[in-house]
From Swiss-Prot:
It is found in: Cytoplasm. It is an enzyme of class 4 (lyase). Its main location: cytoplasm. GO terms for cellular component: cytoplasm. It holds the Pfam family Lyase_aromatic. GO terms for biological process: L-histidine catabolic process to glutamate and formamide; L-histidine catabolic process to glutamate and formate. Belongs to the PAL/histidase family. Its EC number is 4.3.1.3. It comes from Vibrio parahaemolyticus serotype O3:K6 (strain RIMD 2210633). Pathway: Amino-acid degradation; L-histidine degradation into L-glutamate; N-formimidoyl-L-glutamate from L-histidine: step 1/3. This is Histidine ammonia-lyase. InterPro entries: Aromatic_Lyase, Fumarase/histidase_N, HutH, L-Aspartase-like, Phe/His_NH3-lyase_AS. The modification 2,3-didehydroalanine (Ser) is found at residue 144. SUPFAM superfamilies: L-aspartase-like.
Length: 511
């Protein structure tokens, strides 16, 4: 379990990666408390002075011009939570909800939302008790924030809705009891502060980022294995080639291949003086393609780290100036575009892997037995595994279509341009699963090809990667039930063990 002292606005990508993968024991930095309390005092003054301020004593959306009577303010905040909990579909995973909640706490605790410390502490207590609200995956367009998902999260604070604890679904009231809490009555501004924000979209996008990083590492390892299995040249990874083009991420990708292939390879030495002049693009252009993918991963990581530490509420409370300002920080366009770029990277990583695997089973190109099996004809070998890879790669081409270019007006045209960030980010998990499946097939194929090169061995790191697989899946000597082999390789890739074989500090959240 991760023990995390939250300094609002300063959470790292590596910490968020850990939050997304395992339970967390969260503590709020005491230095954040004065700012939180000062922002609530500004809201209290608005009520005391009978001023009209959006979100505090008005309606919402197109109803923003409707003034709410003082005796209805508590009802207003409860009503917005219950009415906006209108999501649909399967529930988010506990991991996604936990990440979303930590992001929400991080944002609220910065002291610009006018929400009491008591409410923030309730969210912290739920996270620490591993009580995760049941939040439907669908129902947000990423502006005005992720209203429906965050409303479902917030219903539990009222003793409403549902939550999961240890895999069991319980009522919101029971969920509070498990965490040692009682239902709360929200004060003015608090319901809106809980609901406004990009935390659902950002949680999905961060998960997509971490998946993309793991896939990048596995694809680089599998790609290096395929170079060796196909008796490919190391010369395309020469740093001089990439230095004259100048793209930092391409130079780093080439360095990663050199790191894996090393110079001490019996397989590499066995064909130093061969007649082959150039390898096909799927081998030779790996640094250029994977470098471009790495650049998209890094660009997206930069955007998402900022967003993870941002205040995306509306209106915002500036206690120093005794001012409350309405704006549009809830609009998740940066998240949507970051997610779209991650989608491109995930799709291309898979597309290139499928082409490498297709090369390996083609004996004319790889000089390996047809379909990577002896006694071809009787045995079909890896023939249909490549078809599976092709199917997954083609699915990702459709899923990679940018979501951020879409928009559909909501709230009677008051909210007339939206980001579609939630879908842009949510589909990344499915795309990642597809690409992991493609890589699983390449992993099996490359290991098979390397075994055909025996007794010659590859570099130390590539032999380690091959041995990881061989401990789970044996050499394919004749046709057998293939699906379990793919599943074993897939499960191994999901553990992200290949990250340890990569150069340090290559990927933004991996340390």
């Amino acid at each position: 379990m991760l023990n995390l002292t939250l300094k609002p606005g300063h959470i790292s990508l590596n910490e968020l990666r850990q939050v997304s993968r395992s339970p967390v024991n969260l503590t709020l930095d005491p230095e954040a408390i004065p700012g939180i309390e000062e922002s609530t005092q500004v809201v209290d003054r608005v009520i005391a002075e009978d001023r009209t301020v959006y979100g505090i004593n008005t309606g919402f959306g197109l109803l923003a011009n409707t003034r709410i009577a003082p005796e209805d303010l508590e009802t207003l905040q409860r009503s917005i939570v219950l009415s906006h909990a209108a999501g649909i579909g399967k529930f988010m995973s506990d991991e996604t909800v936990r990440l979303m909640m930590v992001l929400k706490i991080n944002s609220l605790a910065r002291g610009f939302s006018g929400i009491r410390l008591k409410v923030i502490n309730m969210l912290i207590d739920l996270v620490n008790a591993q009580v995760y609200p049941c939040v439907p995956q669908k129902g947000s367009v990423g502006a005005s924030g992720d209203l429906a998902p965050l409303a479902h999260m917030s219903t539990v604070l009222l003793g409403e809705g549902q939550a999961r604890h240890n895999g069991q679904i319980v009522s919101g009231y029971e969920a509070l009891k498990i965490a040692g809490l009682e239902p709360i009555t929200l004060a003015p501004k608090e319901g809106l502060a809980l609901l406004n924000g990009t935390q659902a979209s950002t949680a999905f996008a961060l998960e997509g980022l971490f998946i993309a990083e793991d896939l990048f590492a596995s694809a680089t390892v599998c790609g290096a294995m395929s170079v060796e299995a196909a008796l490919g040249s190391r010369r395309p990874f020469d740093p001089r080639i990439h230095r004259v083009r100048g793209h930092r991420s391409t130079m780093d990708a080439a360095m990663a291949y050199r790191h894996l292939l090393d110079t001490s390879s019996e397989i590499g030495e066995s064909h130093t003086n061969c007649e082959k002049v150039q390898d096909p693009y799927s081998l030779r252009c790996q640094p250029q393609v994977m470098g471009a993918c790495l650049q998209q991963i890094r660009n997206s990581a930069e955007v998402l780290q900022v967003e993870a530490n941002s205040v995306s509420d509306n209106p915002l409370v500036f206690a120093e100036d005794n001012d409350i300002i309405s704006g549009g920080n809830f609009h998740a366009e940066p998240v949507a575009m970051a997610a779209d770029n991650l989608a491109l990277a995930i799709a291309e990583i898979g597309s290139l892997s499928e082409r490498r695997m297709a090369l390996l089973i083609d004996s004319a190109l790889s000089k390996l037995p047809p379909f990577l099996v002896d006694n071809g004809g009787v045995n079909s070998g890896f023939m249909i595994a490549q078809v599976t890879s092709a199917a997954l790669a083609s699915e990702n081409k459709t899923l990679a279509h940018p979501a951020s270019v879409d928009s559909l007006p909501t709230s009677a045209n008051q909210e007339d341009h939206v980001s579609m960030a939630t879908f842009a980010a949510r589909r990344l998990k499915e795309m990642g699963e597809n690409t992991r499946g493609i890589l699983a097939v390449e992993y099996l194929s490359a290991a098979q090809g390397l075994d055909f090169r025996a007794p010659n061995k590859s570099s130390e790191r590539i032999e380690i990667a091959k041995q990881m697989l061989r401990e789970k899946v044996s050499f394919y000597d004749k046709d057998r039930y293939f699906a379990p082999d793919i599943e074993q390789a897939n499960t191994l890739l999901k553990l992200a063990l290949h990250n340890a074989l990569m150069p340090e500090n290559l990927l933004p959240s991996v340390h």
